[in-house]
Regions:
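ATPase nucleotide-binding head domains, primarily ABC-like/P-loop NTPase cores
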Residues: 3-181
Length: 181
């Protein structure tokens, strides 16, 4: 369908699928409150695929193209940034963790400019231990709350991180269910 592009922060999709996934399960989602949405669920529940599908839908919408959804209301973003599957670099002496820290720093520098952005962070700090990942994720989330002109879509396996913000009005949540058949 052709999305409805709006000059506000309203953002919702109905029936989004990733076009490269055969027999994809459609998902409906909306930014129900705040500027941060935390996606939770078990391994292989579809968090990363859903984030990729949403990001692709937003990108296609901004190109003026049809989107693989039933319906979509999308803000007019001035930038789309992702942190998904970042590579390490032996040549540059950069670990996966360092690559992620540098990417988050880069995204924060874009957000500080005041431009309306969509930022997608897939499992922040997944390449470090659970305690450090939790603490770093909470610290980043606290900073992101201050950028109300941006939307942040964040997936996580760290339930304690999600619980730390469950009553925070800047965050909404999307739980991805999985069924073993």
């Amino acid at each position: 369908c052709m999305p409805v592009m709006v000059p506000t922060m309203d953002f919702s999709v109905e029936g989004v699928v990733h076009p490269f996934v055969k027999d994809a399960q459609p998902n409906s989602w909306q930014m129900s409150r705040g500027n941060i949405c935390i996606f939770t669920g078990s391994n292989m529940a579809g968090k990363s695929t859903t984030l990729k599908a949403l990001t692709l839908a937003v990108w296609l919408a901004h190109c003026g193209l049809p989107v693989p959804v039933k319906s979509m209301i999308c803000p007019l973003y001035e930038g789309i940034y992702t942190s998904i599957n970042l590579p390490d670099s032996l040549r540059d002496g950069r670990s996966h963790f360092m690559a992620e820290v540098l990417r988050i720093k880069e995204v924060m520098q874009k957000a500080v400019t005041g431009k309306r952005c969509l930022v997608v962070l897939d499992e922040m700090f997944r390449r470090t231990n659970a305690k450090d990942a939790f603490e770093a994720s909470v610290a980043v989330n606290e900073l992101l709350k201050g950028f109300s002109h941006c939307h942040f879509l964040i997936s996580t396996h760290i339930l304690e991180y999600a619980k730390a913000f469950e009553k925070d009005s800047s965050c909404c949540f999307y739980y991805m269910e999985a069924e073993i058949i």
